[in-house]
Amino acid sequence: MVKLAKAGKNQGDPKKMAPPPKEVEEDSEDEEMSEDEEDDSSGEEVVIPQKKGKKAAATSAKKVVVSPTKKVAVATPAKKAAVTPGKKAAATPAKKTVTPAKAVTTPGKKGATPGKALVATPGKKGAAIPAKGAKNGKNAKKEDSDEEEDDDSEEDEEDDEDEDEDEDEIEPAAMKAAAAAPASEDEDDEDDEDDEDDDDDEEDDSEEEAMETTPAKGKKAAKVVPVKAKNVAEDEDEEEDDEDEDDDDDEDDEDDDDEDDEEEEEEEEEEPVKEAPGKRKKEMAKQKAAPEAKKQKVEGTEPTTAFNLFVGNLNFNKSAPELKTGISDVFAKNDLAVVDVRIGMTRKFGYVDFESAEDLEKALELTGLKVFGNEIKLEKPKGKDSKKERDARTLLAKNLPYKVTQDELKEVFEDAAEIRLVSKDGKSKGIAYIEFKTEADAEKTFEEKQGTEIDGRSISLYYTGEKGQNQDYRGGKNSTWSGESKTLVLSNLSYSATEETLQEVFEKATFIKVPQNQNGKSKGYAFIEFASFEDAKEALNSCNKREIEGRAIRLELQGPRGSPNARSQPSKTLFVKGLSEDTTEETLKESFDGSVRARIVTDRETGSSKGFGFVDFNSEEDAKAAKEAMEDGEIDGNKVTLDWAKPKGEGGFGGRGGGRGGFGGRGGGRGGRGGFGGRGRGGFGGRGGFRGGRGGGGDHKPQGKKTKFE
C-alpha cells in the first residue's frame, strides 16, 4: 500500500495519469490483484464528494480505478494497462488470495481509505482522505445522497448476487464469454461506474466461488444473454449528460432488474414449449381416434335388402326408436312392407329397406308424407348404384343433330329417366347418354328406337359398359371378334344409295344401316346384319364387288371394334381414318375431348391430306373415353374409323446400317480412317490417302438421310 501512495505523489497533474497505474499493475501482479478491485469500489465514495471545480481530477481518478475490472477503450492508457491484471486476478490463481482481501476491504466501503483514495489524492491535494468527515455545504448534501445511493446499490447487489449464483452453474466456455462481455463495454458512461464498481466486488466474490466449484454441464448458456442486454442499455446511457449521474444510475439498476425478471419469465415460458411435442402427439392420437368413432354414421350395419330408399328431413328431436316406428307406420298405411329402418347418428336422415323393386318404385312416387310433423324427403341413395348397374340401363345415342335439345330427345325416348347431352365449349357433339329406370326399359328402347330419324338424321344406339362390349354393331360397340360375325361392312357405296336399295340386293339381311351426313346423303358405306354367320358369309361370297348404282361395292365381315385388322393394345394415341380432305388438324383435335395434339398425314409432293391422322392424349384412359364417344362418329360430314395407334418402336422397318467410309484425299501419304457407322453420315477420309477407310458396321442406330459429298 505504500507503493500506491508513492504512485499517487508522482502523478502530479491529473492529465498525466497513465504511468502510475502501470506501476500499480506491476506491483499488484506480485501481490493480490483482486484487492485493487475491491479497493476501487470502496474508493468511489471518496471521489464523489469533490467540488465541481475539481471535477476533472476526480474523473481521471475514476478512470484509473475502473480499468482493473473493465477494458474501456478510451484514449487514456491507464485503463488498458490496468485491465489485464484485473482479469487475471479474477480468473486464475488469485482466487485463494482474494478471499482474505475481501474481509479487509468490506468495511472499507464507508471508511473510504485505500486504493482509490490514494490515487485521487494528487488531484485533490490531500483533500480526498478526510472527505468523509468534512461534510460542509454542497458536499454534505452530496454525501447524504450518496449514502442513499449506497443503500440502493446494496439492494441491487443482492439482486445481482442472485444472478451471480445462477452464473455459477455456467459451463467454462460460458464463463469465458461472460468475462469477455464486460470487457467489451468500451464506451460505458462514467455515470454507471459508481454502482457498477460496487457490484464488481460481489461479482468477484461470486466468480471466485464459481471457479472453485465444478460448473454444471446441464446448465444452458442462454444465461449470458443478460450481459448483452446490459451492454446495449449501457451504450444507450453514454449519450446522457454528466449532470444526470444519480438519476441515470438508478434507472440503469432498475432496467437491469427488469431485464433479469423478463429473462426469468422467458425461461419459464420456454419450458412449456418443450412439452408441446408430447402434448401434440397426445392430441394427434385423440384426433385420429375421433374419426374412428364417427365412422358409424348410421345405426345398424349393412342394408338388409338391395332395395333402399333415402329418407331426409326427419325430426331430430325424436329418438331413433320413435323415428323408426313413425317411418314404418307411414309406409304401412300405403300398403308398403318395410324390412328395416336405419336412422343416422344425427337423427336428421335415415334409410328404409324394402322387399322388392316394385315397393321401392311405389315409395318413390309418394309425396307429402309427414313423420312427427316434418314432411320427409324421399329419393334413391346417392352412390348406391354401382357404375356397372348404371351402364346396364344406359344407352349411348350417336349421329344426333347438333341442334337437338333435351326436350326433343325426351319426346323420342319417353321412358328415359335422365338425358345427358355431350358438348364441348357450349357446342353439341351429336352424342347423348340416355339413362332408364330399369335395364328392361333400356333393352326395349334399344330394339324399338334403333335407326330412328331426328331432323333427317338416323340415330345409332349403343349399350354402355360391359354389356356394350358383348354385342355387335347394332349395340354400337362390337364384340370381340370370334371369326363368325353376322354383320358385313359395305364400302365404296354410292352416295345416292339408300337402305331400300340395299335391301333389294341383300334379301336375307335383318338390319341395314346407311350412315348419312348432315345433308341426308349416304357417307359411302353401310352395315348389313344377318340372322346367322352362314347367311352373312353367303352374302359376302355372292355380292362382293357387285355394282350398285354405278359403283362396285366391297364387302368384308365385321371384325373386332369395326375393323378386321384392329389393334388390340390400347395406347395414348388414336388412329383416325376416313377424314375429309378439308379437315384440318385443329378440327380433328377439337373433335376429341381431352386431346392434347392432332396431326394429319399429308402427301409430300402435293401437301394434300391422305385422309387419315393421329390424335394424342395425356393418358390411355382419356383415349379410351374419346374413342368410345366418337365410335362411328363424323368429322366434317365424313364417317371416321378409329383404332389404336401402335406405339413408336413397334414393328416397322429396321434401321439402316452404318454409312460408308470417306474417300481418301488427293496426293500421297496414307489415308485417314473412315467414319463410324450408325451415327449419321460416314466420315471423311484423311488428306493424302490412297483411299478412305471402311465404313462402320450396320448394327448401330438407324442412319439419317444420305448426304452426297462432292
From Swiss-Prot:
Gene3D superfamilies: 3.30.70.330. The modification Omega-N-methylarginine is found at R694. The modification Phosphoserine is found at residues 28, 34, 41-42, 67, 145, 153, 184, 206, 356, 458, 460, 563, 580, 591, 619. Residues 307-383, 393-466, 486-560, 572-647 form the RRM domain. CDD domains: RRM1_NCL, RRM2_NCL, RRM3_NCL, RRM4_NCL. It is found in: Nucleus, Nucleolus; Cytoplasm. Sequence repeats lie at residues 58-65, 75-82, 83-90, 91-98, 99-104, 105-112, 120-127, 128-135. One of its GO terms (biological process) is positive regulation of transcription of nucleolar large rRNA by RNA polymerase I. There is a cross-link at K297, K324, K589 (Glycyl lysine isopeptide (Lys-Gly) (interchain with G-Cter in SUMO1)). Residues 56-107, 122-137, 172-183 have a biased composition (Low complexity). The modification Asymmetric dimethylarginine is found at R656, R660, R666, R670, R673, R679, R681, R687, R691, R694. The modification N6-acetyllysine is found at residues 9, 15-16, 96, 102, 109, 116, 124, 318, 348, 377, 398, 403, 427, 444, 467, 477, 513, 521, 572, 577, 646. One of its GO terms (molecular function) is identical protein binding. Residues 650-696 have a biased composition (Gly residues). The modification Phosphothreonine is found at T69, T76, T84, T92, T99, T106, T113, T121, T214, T301, T367, T405. InterPro entries: Nucleolin_RRM1, Nucleolin_RRM2, Nucleolin_RRM3, Nucleolin_RRM4, Nucleotide-bd_a/b_plait_sf, RBD_domain_sf, RRM_dom, RRM_dom_euk. SMART domains: RRM, RRM_1. Residues 58-135 are annotated as: 8 X 8 AA tandem repeats of X-T-P-X-K-K-X-X. Some glutamate residues are glycylated by TTLL8. This modification occurs exclusively on glutamate residues and results in a glycine chain on the gamma-carboxyl group. There is a cross-link at K297, K324, K370, K377, K513, K577, K589, K624 (Glycyl lysine isopeptide (Lys-Gly) (interchain with G-Cter in SUMO2)). Residues 1-303, 640-710 are annotated as: Disordered. Residues 273-300, 697-710 have a biased composition (Basic and acidic residues). Identified in a IGF2BP1-dependent mRNP granule complex containing untranslated mRNAs. Component of the SWAP complex that consists of NPM1, NCL/nucleolin, PARP1 and SWAP70. Component of a complex which is at least composed of HTATSF1/Tat-SF1, the P-TEFb complex components CDK9 and CCNT1, RNA polymerase II, SUPT5H, and NCL/nucleolin. Interacts with AICDA. Interacts with APTX. Interacts with C1QBP. Interacts with ERBB4. Interacts (via C-terminus) with FMR1 isoform 6 (via N-terminus). Interacts with GZF1; this interaction is important for nucleolar localization of GZF1. Interacts with NSUN2. This is Nucleolin. It comes from Homo sapiens. The lineage of its organism: Eukaryota, Metazoa, Chordata, Craniata, Vertebrata. The gene is NCL.
